[in-house]
Amino acid sequence: MKKLLKSVLVFAALSSASSLQALPVGNPAEPSLMIDGILWEGFGGDPCDPCTTWCDAISMRMGYYGDFVFDRVLKTDVNKEFEMGEALAGASGNTTSTLSKLVERTNPAYGKHMQDAEMFTNAACMTLNIWDRFDVFCTLGATSGYLKGNSASFNLVGLFGDGVNATKPAADSIPNVQLNQSVVELYTDTTFAWSVGARAALWECGCATLGASFQYAQSKPKIEELNVLCNAAEFTINKPKGYVGKEFPLDLTAGTDAATGTKDASIDYHEWQASLSLSYRLNMFTPYIGVKWSRASFDSDTIRIAQPRLVTPVVDITTLNPTIAGCGSVAGANTEGQISDTMQIVSLQLNKMKSRKSCGIAVGTTIVDADKYAVTVETRLIDERAAHVNAQFRF
């Protein structure tokens, strides 16, 4: 049985090196791996000994914490219905639908899967150890992220087929077209991130250790850059701003330098995780394997961001959006429908996202030197593809 356990854990640890802010699971034996300190010798007393004090039971560790998520499995968390303008109507010419009427339509963002979600965290880790069995720890550092998804996930919409004889839509016009065949990506800035957690070695038998942990993490990075890759309306915004809690129609100044009532776009990230893992010590190496259950949310207050455009038209245009039918107007130049052939008042919203899968596995190994220093390498699969590095020492 011992040989089988050794083989499974060693294979898991070696496999973790070849595959690749979420939260790491960590080694369940970590509270008892470093039993000596660089400044003070370790104490292995009995907690039931009346002569033992809390000073003998407590020790401190510090080190580097690096967590690198290459693909977090996320989906949107939105309603099934989405309010926007009436769908296009009419076999030819400009649309016959009412441009100022707000209706409920099927939400293309409902249950949509994100194509890519990355998060990179570098932090300092501080751990309070009790009786070489329990760890209470926190991390303080910085994180940055990247998100990419189909434009349907972000409710990218625009106005098309407007028959008004003008260079810009009316103030009460509402987007009537869903632009779902495009890509939206965003980059966040590097911002402060923190996490807290606890880990306990629940059961030990020889060199094997069964442990459990619980962690919570939080960060709120701002959007540094937003890219919309759409043939009908392609644009990039640095440090985007938008409207929170505002329904259609947006102000005609939306997307211009004259816009008011906007706020910086940011992502409020929260995650909590519980895990159970098993390790086996082999001299300097302690491989482990674990299972985890976690829930993460990315909330941007459903902020709506408008395409950048000019306040006043220049050569009768406010954006560089291309024509759809190949001419400036479906109805012809200088007649009704001057702007009907280009996408107008384009905007998108940053929908709330959450974990698509709750369960995952983690495999890794810890290398201990002189019972004072340790380096842990871990990878996580199923609900995310991530790698974790932790280097620490005991005082």
Swiss-Prot record:
Pfam families: Chlam_OMP (PF01308). The keyword Membrane applies. One of its GO terms (cellular component) is pore complex. It is a multi-pass membrane protein. GO terms for molecular function: porin activity; structural molecule activity. Keywords: Cell outer membrane, Cell shape, Disulfide bond, Ion transport, Membrane, Porin, Signal, Transmembrane, Transmembrane beta strand, Transport. Residues 1-22 form the signal peptide. Transmembrane segments: none annotated. It is found in: Cell outer membrane. GO terms for biological process: monoatomic ion transport; regulation of cell shape. Its main location: membrane. Part of a disulfide cross-linked outer membrane complex (COMC) composed of the major outer membrane porin (MOMP), the small cysteine-rich protein (OmcA) and the large cysteine-rich periplasmic protein (OmcB). Belongs to the chlamydial porin (CP) (TC 1.B.2) family. In elementary bodies (EBs, the infectious stage, which is able to survive outside the host cell) provides the structural integrity of the outer envelope through disulfide cross-links with the small cysteine-rich protein and the large cysteine-rich periplasmic protein. It has been described in publications as the Sarkosyl-insoluble COMC (Chlamydia outer membrane complex), and serves as the functional equivalent of peptidoglycan. Permits diffusion of specific solutes through the outer membrane. This is Major outer membrane porin, serovar F. It comes from Chlamydia trachomatis. The lineage of its organism: Bacteria, Pseudomonadati, Chlamydiota, Chlamydiia, Chlamydiales. The gene is ompA.
